[in-house]
């Protein structure tokens, strides 16, 4: 089958897209990828890992209108012409839409009613409520998360298949929209085997932290990720775990606030902000981590999605300490890979860290369970078979 994936972003950037495409190609399908370039000088036709990449120009100014995709129709009309050209030129037989932002453009272009799959990378209507630009004075006037939710429900109903990140997301959509659960396939953003089996290590990173008891945080550091609560807990933990070090690998516009909190709490010697790093550096940090943390705050989005970091932690046998938001709770309890603490509760977080620090046998058990869960159940080569089966129906 000729599958046309639609991504309104440059490529390659998103591992979810490339992982799904690779699985479908290995199953015998032909995958064409519509994507955009912000540069006028670009390679229009490309082949990357057998994915037939077709790039189309989109200025950064016009791309900003994607935030208004369900307020004004400019972006929809502009992108739909390009998508229509892509569909005809490549004789696409099935359209695979990567997230709700571009969905209206695809359906406007789909004049011949080609079968569609809507791939929801996250609960966009809920998470956008926390975006800085949405909460600006102008954003509050122009951008309505409620309109995005209405659009999401509309295109879920119109699509032949829907893909979500977690079982919790599947359950939430099934109840909210009243559609059959068999229409929805779960595909989490987990790791490929090569991530944890074929990698290089940076000795300078390892040497800096090898004598420390490392709490590792990977990923975006925005307020809703809960790092301010963790930093507050360091005030107590540093007196109980002398070689403690919180290592933060990631960044966001909230970093200045986090760094100010570190100074205010006088814990500068116990926190290392590493900044944003390429994924190729992650194995070095994971190899020196004693515990991987995911202290997400509670909201509908976090209840229905997995942070990529939890699978990255697990693949290196790094025990987890996670806030008890629903999706994380399911992973911890099903695979016995770590401990939960009450969301946004620094005392409970501190207590949980200290208990694991004092119990080396439990840490070893969780570490082994992490590796078993990834190798036998949760690596991408296994979970991607759900998408292959969906297309085989």
Model-derived segments and spans:
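A short, well-ordered alpha-helix in the C-terminal region of glycosyltransferases
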Residues: 348-351, 355, 362-377, 386-389
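Membrane-proximal helix-turn-helix segments that form the acceptor-binding/catalytic region
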Residues: 77-85, 104, 108, 124-126, ...
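Nucleotide-activated donor-binding/catalytic signature segment of Leloir-type glycosyltransferases, i.e.
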Residues: 249, 256-283
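Conserved donor-binding/catalytic core segment of Leloir-type glycosyltransferases
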Residues: 163, 208-234, 367
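Carbohydrate-associated surface elements
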Residues: 168, 190
